[in-house]
């Protein structure tokens, strides 16, 4: 029989005290600061070794755009990230945001033929995709550099004049159903489903996110297409979007491509509700969840509910704790567990994060003996954390981490165009655009 996957949720008190200590070291932090700003840039801080040029512009409709000029790029790319996702599903329309993502690319007023955009991208050496998360929906593509403007001409109308052709509703509804069924026996999805069942019912994360034939069915006087249009018209507002465009052209040329095409997106000054409730009620904590996997897996994850960490991007307390807890050298938590014969691997960090909170998790790959001794192992983890808390956060260690981060920013490797723009478009919602290259 496969071993159990354990997920333990604890009060955040111990870890919060550690975070408070890390935050107190703000004055000791090493910040890349103006000295790392490329001389060729006016409003975006980049590594001095980054030869690309950047420009941030805000269009008349409040759409923030990051332009990237890279004459050496093999592919041009663009990404538009909407700060809206499954959290914005209507209560009785689970999966609607995901369904909208599917329906969006089925023709526009300017290019009415479904699949025309996809065909154009494929015929010119490119790729395209999209993804719906809890709070983001990200659309992106890359293409042979000389075809960027023509690709943008097809991409932009999806966000101001899509057709949402009714004759494709059944086809895309079945495509969503197929995605849902494909992951039913995936252990990661099964763990996620069990976690959602424990989330406070008032929190949007407690709801089913993918969608299927049942949740997307046409109801009496409520066809799903009509509700899809309502969701689009309410939330696909320029003030909730970030656009990143990378091309071989100059910044002025890129701006000339973008402004007329994306200024047409409507701005409703939409505000998104921020859910202040905790993911899991304090009354339920500490909470132990056991999941029997379909594959041979032995893992334990200990999670702590914390405030949103993104506002502390300059100080990076969660990253400091992740490095401290996830260290693998002599005297580390992992080494201690290995000496007991209980663990094979360990990682730590703030993973799930939304507009109001985050989860900091310690994930441990167990040996067969570690699985048997999982209760004792958990006690040992908490004892180790308490020892670190009692000893306090050492300024020299924090400064060392900050120096390493500054060095990594200075000598960062160049990413592929499509992944780069997709990541930046999402990060622009979290950090000041001037700092987005170094904040994440």
Label for each model-derived stretch:
Residues 77-142, 207-212, 327-345, 349-358, ...:
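M16/MPP (pitrilysin/insulinase) zinc-metallopeptidase core fold and M16-derived inactive scaffolds
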């Amino acid at each position: 029989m496969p071993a159990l996957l354990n997920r333990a949720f604890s009060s955040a008190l111990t870890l919060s005290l550690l975070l408070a200590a890390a935050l107190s070291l703000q004055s000791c932090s090493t910040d890349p600061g103006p000295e790392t700003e490329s001389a060729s840039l006016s409003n975006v801080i980049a590594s001095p070794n980054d030869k690309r040029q950047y420009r941030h512009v805000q269009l008349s409709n409040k759409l923030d755009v990051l332009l990237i000029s890279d004459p050496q790029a093999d592919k041009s790319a663009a990404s538009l990230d909407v700060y809206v996702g499954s959290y914005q599903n209507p209560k009785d329309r689970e999966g609607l945001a995901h369904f909208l993502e599917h329906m969006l690319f089925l023709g526009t007023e300017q290019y009415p033929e479904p699949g025309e955009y996809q065909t154009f991208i494929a015929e010119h050496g490119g790729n395209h995709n999209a993804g719906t998360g809890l709070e983001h929906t990200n659309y992106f593509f890359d293409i042979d550099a000389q075809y960027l403007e023509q690709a943008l001409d097809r991409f932009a109308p999806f966000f101001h004049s899509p057709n949402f052709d009714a004759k494709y509703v059944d086809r895309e509804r079945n495509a969503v159903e197929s995605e849902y069924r494909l992951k039913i026996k995936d252990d990661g999805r099964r763990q996620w489903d069990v976690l959602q069942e424990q989330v406070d019912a008032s929190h949007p994360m407690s709801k089913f996110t993918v969608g299927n034939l049942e949740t997307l069915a046409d109801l009496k006087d409520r066809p799903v297409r009509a509700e899809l249009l309502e969701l689009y018209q309410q939330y696909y507002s320029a003030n909730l979007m970030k656009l990143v465009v990378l091309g071989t052209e100059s910044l002025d040329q890129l701006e000339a491509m973008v402004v007329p095409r994306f200024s047409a997106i409507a701005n409703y000054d939409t505000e998104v509700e921020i859910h202040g409730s905790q993911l899991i009620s304090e009354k339920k904590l500490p909470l132990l969840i056991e999941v029997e996997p379909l594959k041979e897996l032995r893992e334990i994850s200990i999670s702590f509910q914390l405030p949103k960490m993104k506002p502390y991007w300059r100080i990076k307390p969660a990253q400091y704790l992740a490095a401290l807890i996830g260290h693998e050298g002599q005297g580390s938590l992992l080494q201690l567990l290995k000496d007991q014969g209980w663990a094979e691997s360990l990682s730590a960090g703030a993973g799930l994060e939304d507009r109001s909170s985050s989860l900091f998790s310690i994930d441990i790959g167990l040996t067969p003996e570690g699985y048997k001794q999982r209760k004792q192992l958990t006690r040992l983890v908490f004892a180790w954390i308490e020892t670190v808390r009692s000893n306090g956060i050492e300024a020299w260690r924090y400064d060392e981490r900050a120096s390493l981060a500054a060095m990594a920013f200075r000598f960062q490797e160049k990413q592929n165009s499509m992944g780069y723009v997709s990541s930046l478009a999402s990060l622009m919602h979290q950090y000041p655009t001037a700092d987005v290259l170094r904040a994440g």
